[in-house]
């Protein structure tokens, strides 16, 4: 998956403000907003009107240089501009303001490969893959070329390192990358007494090189250059076998030389961790210091000024623990998991845990060395094989029960970032049934409801009533036990976030008990427009207006409950 980071550097901001630059690009001072996009190394000015909708701006970006844009994120003033039906002015954009954007381009890249003897063939690979993967594909396609590690790939005369990402090679705007493959020189040693003689062989001829006295350095143990290990706050916690195996398989891949592959999708640093063969992904690692608007974010986003994340009510650097918390609270029908059990949760959140990890291929803007200060702490989530995400296909084919299980999770956790792109689609191996897997839960558990968004709200499945099994699961939920469970795992969830969790769970339980559909319950939680408060926000404000400031949390929640009952009765009668 490829992302073009569209962010303004300080140098570019000076360029925009430099006298005469406006006229040079053919714009007048009367133009309300100028947006400068950097895509594939080019700076492209675009005019944006205050009355333009967010959707129209995204459509305009799609036409730039013929790029096929699958997904875009627009950022302004540290906040994601996410509501397509809102206007530019709704987000406070005015004359002279600058937008930061992240867009996702087509996942696939065409590669033309030519051998030294003139043979040519083509490959199509994901942009998130690296050069080493391309070598493996070449070897499987052209058997006579031999072992992948014995070859060199060059681009414009430059030898490419195996860990180089394909997306990094797409800098000249060409639709096809042209590579040259040749056999690399082989080095072998022949013992001669206490010395050894070194031979270097290439495709056409051999050379003798003077040897040196000493041991063969290849037999010496290499110094440790990486590690992956659990990050556990509470020593009473014992990792289940599934999570231990997840960490172990991730480490085995690194030991075989298969380094992390940074995903070019999304606005934070996320790394695909490979298995020992290098052919499959086993996990996804998200360091806290590379989250959106964090200090080491690899996409060049501005650092958060007040600590708030892209979504209102979230904090930069807390995305990883929220990812883990979503897995912990997504327990099965039988209730919270107990050691050593590791059953799949009701909504199917992939197994996730906190780890410490060190590797040179993570983002180290100040340079890398094998030292404690370069250790990354973040979430490690099991990779789920899939055939795409929900944004890649029509939503009418999704099973009702699969959509409903995700709605339960999102309403309960007050998810501020549920879109079709973070719901994976796969097929059950037994009967081929479609399975939806929710991922990316770094914006759950906010301290306010302002940015709650559920894309499934507009799918027809959301207007179907919950099944008896789902209602039974919802009935069993207990926010107080959930809060204690999170604390046991080391997250001292802030009081403002626990309040939201209590109220969101209350809404889910009360609404479903009255026969309300996911659509109705979700509509109560989400805003219809950017500036119009949701029903749940109105209920909270009504409660705040009634109770005195020194009221206990239990008394406040009781007041919210009474007001909510009255509101929900109106929905039930309709």
UniProtKB/Swiss-Prot annotation:
The keyword Repeat applies. PROSITE patterns: PI3_4_KINASE_3, UBIQUITIN_2. It catalyses: a 1,2-diacyl-sn-glycero-3-phospho-(1D-myo-inositol) + ATP = a 1,2-diacyl-sn-glycero-3-phospho-(1D-myo-inositol 4-phosphate) + ADP + H(+). Residues 438-464 are annotated as: Activation loop. Its EC number is 2.7.1.67. Keywords: ATP-binding, Kinase, Nucleotide-binding, Repeat, Transferase. SMART domains: UBQ. Residues 257-555 form the PI3K/PI4K catalytic domain. The phosphorylation of phosphatidylinositol (PI) to PI4P is the first committed step in the generation of phosphatidylinositol 4,5-bisphosphate (PIP2), a precursor of the second messenger inositol 1,4,5-trisphosphate (InsP3). This is Phosphatidylinositol 4-kinase gamma 3. It comes from Arabidopsis thaliana (Mouse-ear cress). The lineage of its organism: Eukaryota, Viridiplantae, Streptophyta, Embryophyta, Tracheophyta.
């Amino acid at each position: 998956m490829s992302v073009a980071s569209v962010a303004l550097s300080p140098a570019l901001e000076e360029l925009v403000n430099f006298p005469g630059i406006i006229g040079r690009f053919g714009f007048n001072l009367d133009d309300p907003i100028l947006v400068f996009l950097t895509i594939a190394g080019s700076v492209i000015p675009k005019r944006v009107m205050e009355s333009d909708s967010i959707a129209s701006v995204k459509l305009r970006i799609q036409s730039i240089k013929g790029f096929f844009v699958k997904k875009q994120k627009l950022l302004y003033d540290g906040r994601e501009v996410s509501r397509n039906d809102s206007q530019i002015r709704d987000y406070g954009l005015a004359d002279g303001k600058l937008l930061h954007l992240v867009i996702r381009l087509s996942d696939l890249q065409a590669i033309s490969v030519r051998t030294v003897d003139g043979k040519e063939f083509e490959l199509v690979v994901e942009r998130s893959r690296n050069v080493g993967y391309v070598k493996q594909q070449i070897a499987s396609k052209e058997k006579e070329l031999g072992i992948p590690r014995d070859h060199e790939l060059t681009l414009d005369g430059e030898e490419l390192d195996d860990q180089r990402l394909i997306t990094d090679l797409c800098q000249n705007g060409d639709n096809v990358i042209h590579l040259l493959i040749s056999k690399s020189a082989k080095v072998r040693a022949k013992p001669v007494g206490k010395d050894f003689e070194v031979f270097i062989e290439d495709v056409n001829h051999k050379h003798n090189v003077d040897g040196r006295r000493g041991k063969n350095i290849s037999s010496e143990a290499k110094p440790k250059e990486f590690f992956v290990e659990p990050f556990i706050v509470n020593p009473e916690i014992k990792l289940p076998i599934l999570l231990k195996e997840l960490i172990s398989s991730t480490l085995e891949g690194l030991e075989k030389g298969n380094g992390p592959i940074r995903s070019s999708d999304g606005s934070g640093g996320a790394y695909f961790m490979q298995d020992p063969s290098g052919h499959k992904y086993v996990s996804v690692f998200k360091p806290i210091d590379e989250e959106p608007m964090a200090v080491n974010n690899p996409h060049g986003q501005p650092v958060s000024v007040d600590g708030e994340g892209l979504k209102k009510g979230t904090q930069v650097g807390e995305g990883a623990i929220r990812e883990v918390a979503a897995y912990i609270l997504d327990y099965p029908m039988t209730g919270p998991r107990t050691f050593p059990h590791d059953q799949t949760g009701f909504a199917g959140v992939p197994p996730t845990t906190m780890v410490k990890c060190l590797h040179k291929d993570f983002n180290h803007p100040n340079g890398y060395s094998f030292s404690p200060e370069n250790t990354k702490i973040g979430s490690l989530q099991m990779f789920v094989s899939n055939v795409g995400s929900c944004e890649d296909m029509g939503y009418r084919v999704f099973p009702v029960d699969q959509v409903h299980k995700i709605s339960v999770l999102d309403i309960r956790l007050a998810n501020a970032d549920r879109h079709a792109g973070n719901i994976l689609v796969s097929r059950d191996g037994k009967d081929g049934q479609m399975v939806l897997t929710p991922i990316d839960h770094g914006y759950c558990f906010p301290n306010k409801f302002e940015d709650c968004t559920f894309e499934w709200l507009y799918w027809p499945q959301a207007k179907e009533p919950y099944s008896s099994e789902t209602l039974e699961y919802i009935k069993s939920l207990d926010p107080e036990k959930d809060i204690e469970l999170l604390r046991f795992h080391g997250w001292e969830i802030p009081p403002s976030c626990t309040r939201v969790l209590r109220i969101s769970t209350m809404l889910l339980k009360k609404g479903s008990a009255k026969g309300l559909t996911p659509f109705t319950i979700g509509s109560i939680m989400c805003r219809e427009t950017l500036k119009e408060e949701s029903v749940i926000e109105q209920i909270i404000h009504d409660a705040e207006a009634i109770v005195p400031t020194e009221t206990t949390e239990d008394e406040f929640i009781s007041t919210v409950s009474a007001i909510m009952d009255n509101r929900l009765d109106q929905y039930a009668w309709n």
